[in-house]
Amino acid sequence: MNFKVLYQDNNARCGVFNFNQEIIETPVFMPVGTYGAVKSISTEEIKNTGSRIILSNAFHLYFRPGLEIIKLHGNLHNFMNWSGPILTDSGGFQVFSLSRFCKVNEEGVIFQNHIDGKKTFLTPKISMKIQSDLGSNIVMIFDQCIEYNQNWEKTKNAMERSLYWAKKSRIYFDSYKNKNSLFGIIHGGIYPSLRDISLQELIKIDFDGYALGGLAVGEPKIEMYKLLDHICPQIPKNKPRYLMGVGKPEDLIEGVRRGVDMFDCVIPTRNARNGHLFVTNGVIKIRNKKYKKDLSCLDNTCVCYTCRYYSRSYLHHLDACNEILGARLNTIHNLHYYQTLMSNIRNSIKNNTFEQFSVNFYKQKNKIDF
């Protein structure tokens, strides 16, 4: 993977990834396909929303369907029929958030897996092997995630352990001699001084990109933005910056404003399944009875499949009947909205009009009552 920044408007950056001749423009939003599927839609439909790179979760795929099944197909790309790049999360977050029993030592984590309750040992070495077997284009280091608002000492200990695992991840990743990329993850909770130490040590190890972990886990938005203001300027300018698990449309705007290049989040797909649909002026809650006889499309500025062929009335009906088609059409629309937003952001950076674009974005938002 090669990465190059081509345009800059203040701190906002527009660049390109080159994955073996496949070009991905940044800033980029990655739909989440945890189990090798973006819920309710096919890979062809994912591509038609404008999505070119997706995220899957190595932790979940390790347990279901298991590496043996995926390797029968060659790799995860073949298994799910996706020709574009895939970033895999190592599973650190899931280990610490899903497990009923979790014991951490220097080598890794012993936990009860959420499938059958069996004790499982996961280490940087195992995580790198899993992601290598999946054929991930971007591999994330194995890290220790902690809850928001932990005290300084607990946060420092977790950050230092993540650094130790980062070094191990680098060694084991390099041993596979593949041409894929490895990203480090900056930790340190809400403490800027710990974030500084984490980043500087990760830079010494030398990763292909740097992710900001442990954000959007309960902290006030202003706190997240302040941390981005603090840490993004310190990340090497020639390396991509990835804000993990974020965000809402306004988070994408504010992340890009601070120099972030990559995002992922379940919000567009999860909200779609719950009938919350993103449009130019805000959010439509399609299950509200006011849409029962509304013959208009979701958003007359949108050219997605859903907006071209279906009315709000029909989408309201599908939601009321719990029809699977409703989730599918809603997901297509929300992902198309996100990818259109990212495309517009990129164009504004290229034209040095990002600030005006963001002003217009907030002006349009919530102009009418949904």
Curated annotation (Swiss-Prot):
Presence of the UniProt keyword tRNA processing in the record: yes
Listed pathway(s): tRNA modification; tRNA-queuosine biosynthesis
Any one GO MF annotation of this record: metal ion binding
Binding residues annotated for Zn(2+), in chain numbering: 302, 304, 307, 333
Gene Ontology terms: cellular component: cytosol
Quaternary assembly: Homodimer. Within each dimer, one monomer is responsible for RNA recognition and catalysis, while the other monomer binds to the replacement base PreQ1.
Protein name (record): Queuine tRNA-ribosyltransferase
Species whose genome carries this gene: Buchnera aphidicola subsp. Acyrthosiphon pisum (strain APS) (Acyrthosiphon pisum symbiotic bacterium)
